[in-house]
Amino acid sequence: MSELECPGLPASWLNAWLAAVGITALVPEMRLSWTDGPAPQGLLATSDGRDPVRALTSAWPSPERIAEMPIAEQLHGCEDIVPNLPLRTFRERAERFRGHDDSWSISSTYTDLHVDETQPGVVLAARSRFAPPAPGPVGPIHRRLTRVFGFVDEPFAQITATLEGGARRVNANGLGFDISRVTTLADDSDKSVDPVLEVLAFFGLSLLPIRGAGTRRTAQSRSAYLAARQRLWFLDSDDGRRHRLMWPAWSHSLGRNGIDALLDAWSPLNRGTWRRLGVHAGWRSVEYRWQGNDPTRGIGSEAL
């Protein structure tokens, strides 16, 4: 297999980890593992011997695919997608696009297995933590994806730069959860992201569906035990009141289905399972603490 080490995909950086997983979602022949040592980096290999960069360039999504995704903000014949999504709108999209290749874009963003009834007269589908609300023109997650996708006009060159760790950043908010776009509280400069990484990270979400236990969130019931939970979000053992994202690095070269199986089997708080699965490192989320009315969100990491 043709193998490529990617300094631009450090496993400790959540968006880079998601991007690496997203590559396997876009390229069925792609295999992913992580280097050993204190700072694991992505290792990409193709089962058919193709150069990983050229294979990914060939599979880069078209503008039509992005525009016609089931999660698209506006689609003919459907109610518009808004950040606080009415349950009826979610169900309309889920039913219409059942079996669609990108139906995961709905199930990794919203769920009807936990609903929000905290606002009188409206029932909302639970929303992923990866689709944080954003004010004004930033809009819902598909609008953010579309904007950042538009910055990728030379896929081969830009993919190469991203994997090498030398990508040129652009002034954009990206998907809205990359901690590296946040500087300091005193810095009100424009946020910047790597557009290739953000697009790939979105496809990485295809392996992280959001689910629930058929419960309701009301003004009287807000328990973390009953909340919707996305794959890899675990109840925090430190306080038992919030969920934290936890993700692994592994040594075996795995395709999308293999990664899917590993994420099902991995128990981050039971280190006895790590070696059996080839997992040699893991991280948990540390979220940006905003102040006042600051709408900024971001997810960083600390080693498990």
What is the predicted function of each stretch?
Residues 164-178:
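Active-site-adjacent bridging/hinge elements
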Residues 2-11, 21, 163, 189-192, ...:
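Elongated scaffolding segments in large macromolecular assemblies
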Residues 168-170, 187, 240:
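A generic structural signal for short, non-catalytic loop/turn and secondary-structure boundary residues
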Residues 158-159, 175-176, 225-229:
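Short amphipathic alpha-helical surface micro-motifs
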Residues 1-161, 177, 181-182, 201, ...:
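Conserved small-residue
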Residues 177-193:
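Amphipathic interfacial helices
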